[in-house]
């Protein structure tokens, strides 16, 4: 008869957490920054098609690090949730807090019940009418959720990058200043002062999209030429 080995629940959860952390640590970092013009989302990502940043709904965006197939399935599920809720009730009922709660439940269920946890970390951002009304939520592989103030940093070098951002971030930063700060921070432990525009994926949730762009959709993906222009502007 084969001997059954006992593994305590504490050890099982620790092993799952260590497994997920190692997977996330291999991923390139993402920075999400609240600024005067809106919310800037910047990811170290040279791929032009495999996006780590995406639009969820009118004023809500998503950013992730980790395994692409896992966070892409979560992004698509978030879009479906937002569309159904907005259609069934009202567009104003679709909020970053509600979406983050759904993600937290999904991640927590996978972490405790499935064979392996998701190797992902997520950020859900919602731009407000004023900067005080911005919402930034960070979700980890086990379903833990945190309401962040000002900025979110995720990925393998999150602690070092967060120190750089925290040392220079101010609420008064404009979009150009937020982008320049993010690129300096993402260059941590690299032989350059800041990452080139071609090495990153970037997007913005504009604060005054309805008055400036005539649309409720605040999300806009930034092209390399947009990034080049922003990097030459004064912050």
UniProtKB/Swiss-Prot annotation:
Summarizing activity control, the record says: The formation of the proteasomal ATPase ARC-20S proteasome complex, likely via the docking of the C-termini of ARC into the intersubunit pockets in the alpha-rings, may trigger opening of the gate for substrate entry. Interconversion between the open-gate and close-gate conformations leads to a dynamic regulation of the 20S proteasome proteolysis activity.
Subcellular localization? Cytoplasm
Biological process GO annotation list? modification-dependent protein catabolic process; proteasomal protein catabolic process
Keywords in alphabetical order, please: Cytoplasm, Proteasome
Instruction: Give one Pfam family.
Output: Proteasome
**Pathway terms, separated by semicolons:** Protein degradation; proteasomal Pup-dependent pathway
Keyword Protease carried by entry: no
Gene Ontology terms, cellular component aspect? cytoplasm; proteasome core complex, alpha-subunit complex
Q: Which GO terms describe its molecular function?
A: threonine-type endopeptidase activity
Lineage top rank: taxon: Bacteria
Q: Does the keyword Heme apply?
A: no
Q: Which residues form a coiled coil?
A: none
User: Cross-referenced PROSITE patterns, in alphabetical order?
Assistant: PROTEASOME_ALPHA_2
InterPro entries linked: Ntn_hydrolases_N (IPR029055), Proteasome_alpha-type (IPR023332), Proteasome_asu_bac (IPR022296), Proteasome_sua/b (IPR001353)
Function according to Swiss-Prot or TrEMBL:
Component of the proteasome core, a large protease complex with broad specificity involved in protein degradation.
Q: How does it assemble?
A: The 20S proteasome core is composed of 14 alpha and 14 beta subunits that assemble into four stacked heptameric rings, resulting in a barrel-shaped structure. The two inner rings, each composed of seven catalytic beta subunits, are sandwiched by two outer rings, each composed of seven alpha subunits. The catalytic chamber with the active sites is on the inside of the barrel. Has a gated structure, the ends of the cylinder being occluded by the N-termini of the alpha-subunits. Is capped by the proteasome-associated ATPase, ARC.
- Give the family this protein belongs to, as stated in its UniProt record: Belongs to the peptidase T1A family.
Protein name, please? Proteasome subunit alpha
Organism equals Paenarthrobacter aurescens (strain TC1)
